[in-house]
Structure formats: structure tokens, C-alpha cells
Amino acid sequence: MKVICEKTKSPLVISIPHSGTDIPQDIDSLCNLAAKREHTDWALQELVTPLSETTLVATVSRYIVDVNRFKPRTGKATQPIIPRIDEKGNLLFNNYPSKQKQVNWLERYYTPYYLHLENLLNEKLEHHKRVLLVDLHSYDDKLFNTSDIILGTRKKQTLSPATLEQLQILFHEEGLTTQVDTPFSGGNIIATFGKQARIEAVQIEVPYSL
């Protein structure tokens, strides 16, 4: 992972969990070269860099470890976090990682992302009464009946009505239309941090065509 503009004065932290393209060498040998990885969130780093806001970026591909997925509540399976197939149904791995490898990958990539994000948010809370976490994504609007900006709030559990309205106004002033929680309501990142005191969180999905 990497951080862009770690020290800023604003109460905003941006998370980009799905732009990573790295496949570590020890993992690459397990991968199926024929698999597609089309739903990487392209160009988001270029979008946020001019904003000069504190941003955490996952550098490892979401097709290796998806840091926005929920851990299973029971059992030890990590399939939701370490996917098995691509969008076309192709196996992502010639040899799906053993349980021990799965645990190791989560320790290397999943847990550190949350710890680092928590540290960035706590640092902001030392200087601000409230902090906003934006979990930034992009989506292929050819696959959905919309090209709106999607604001995910976990059914309005992670974001106050006032902040949601402010965000909608900001996008509308730029000529952009928005939808709330449809078709994306947000993943584990906003679910984890959006329920914490003094932190609001929103998942923002930007269409590829924008």
C-alpha cells in the first residue's frame, strides 16, 4: 500500500482499495495467466492526486486480496476476500492457495490496510471534531442501467443526512447526477469505520465513462 499526502489540514481521508495491479512474485506462480482482471478501478489515483488530500491506496490487486470484502463471521474460510474466479468465470489461480497461505496473505495485505487507515483517521481526529472517510471506486457503467455517481452509505448507516445532502449538492453543481445505495451500498471499509464515533464514511463509485 502507499499513502499520498499523508499530512494535510483537512478532515478528509480517501481510501482507494481496488486500483492495485501488483501481483507479488511468490503469488504470481499460482495464478492463471488466462484469467481476466478487468474490474480494477482504473485512473483513480490520477483523479485524486491534484486534490492533495490524505489518500491510502492498496497496491496489490483486488484479485489477490480484496480489502473491501467482509471477513466471514463463522468458520475460517476467506474465499470472499481471496476470490476464486474472474468476471468471465475463469479460475484466477491454477492452484488456489492453501488455508495457511490465505491466512498469510490476509496478514500481509488485508489487516495492514485497516490498521493504516485507522491510524490516518485517528490522526485526523486529533485535530478535527469529525472526520469524513471517502472510499473511492469506479464501475463499468456499460453493465448497469446508470451512469450516475453512486453514493454508498450502508442504507444511510455510515453517513448523516446532512453530509449526504452536501455531497449530492456538490456533485450536482458539477453537472453530475447521483444515486444512493443502488446498485452499490458500500463494503467492509465504510461498514467498519462509519460506525465509529466522530467518523462518517461513504463509498463513492465513479462510472468509467466519466
Where are these regions (language model features)?
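N-terminal catalytic or cofactor-binding beta/alpha core of small enzyme domains
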Residues: M1-L133, S138-L210
